[in-house]
Amino acid sequence: MNLPSNATIARFSVLAPLAFTGCRSHDFPQYPSNYREYAYVTNGGSNTVTVLDVVNVRVDRELAVGQKPVAVAVSPTRNEVYVVNSGAADGLGSVSVINAENNTVAGAINVHRQPVSIEIDSTGGLAYVANSGSNTISVLDLKARREIAAMGAGEEPVAARLSPDNKTLVVANRRGNSVSLFDTATRRLRAIFEGCPGASDAVILPDSSKAFVPCSAGHQIMAIALARAEIRPTQPGSAQFVPARPDRLEALLDVGQAPLQLALKPDGGELFALNSLSDSISEVNTTTDDINNATIIGGTPVRGLVSADNSVLYVANFRSQYVTVYAIDDGKRIGSIHAGDGSSALAFSSSGLLLFVVDTRSGDVAVARTTSRSFFTLLPAGRAPNAIALKAFKLP
């Protein structure tokens, strides 16, 4: 296990108490004694996960997992955390299972070559893992902790996203320059759409009607209208008849250069393309597919996260040591928050009062207050941290 050096620990131990000085009470809610909340940070360079105690804003521990952890997700129904380990280039990957109640590694699930992402359904029963090195999607039974199916995708699938109704899996195939759609009930390929160079991510609207995929090797977003079953009125006057609709390509939207990721507002009304080579964001109306605004945002924007009230977008800039704050209604930058070097992932605390920023180059996690939109403290992580997920729960 690779732990921070004594010098690093000393530096952070000085920063932490200073950060708490003058802290306003509304930044830290009063929790019951059995409340727990942790942030799990994957460290790709040290084969570990750093566990952060969110309630007390401190490092809880560091766990050894598999080789090259690259993604993490939490169960919506159990106190478990799932870490994707991409493994050696010529070997198989795995998914480590962490028991969140005692923060220990409880098991591992073998998958295929170079897994890079994980998506969990709303029941917490199934997970979908994109295996970029074997061009497959592993379907995992999380209760049994085993793979139950493998679906063939396009070349180098890097993101698998599940629609909110759990019926459609949208897969971005980066090297295949395509998007695959799977029916989750039958686990069969339903459609494939070509012409998205470097497909790298996907977001799906809350009503499961449409998916958007950034084409990171170009300057476009692919908008796909998802299939809809026929809806018939159950009784006179209850509803209008809605005809069935197949999956179809709706539009290719021009944005900035190399859009790596999309940030969707919680209400689904707008999304933001992070244009990494244009140092900008593009604001897209998800109903009309219109580009509402384009704004210079920072050095190599790679991740965005929208506040729960749909008002503020936070953007992690890999090539600068700050997070840009963007007011959505006003369509402009309103500030920046200091972070570490190489910011690459973002997550809110469950209260929304704290923002955690993963800094890949400096090997730390910056913590910011969202009420004042200001830097709060810096916590150490392992080498090359790259992803984060938070889990909150109450002990019995």
Region roles according to the model:
Residues 23-396:
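Predominantly soluble domains enriched in secretory-pathway, periplasmic, or organellar proteins
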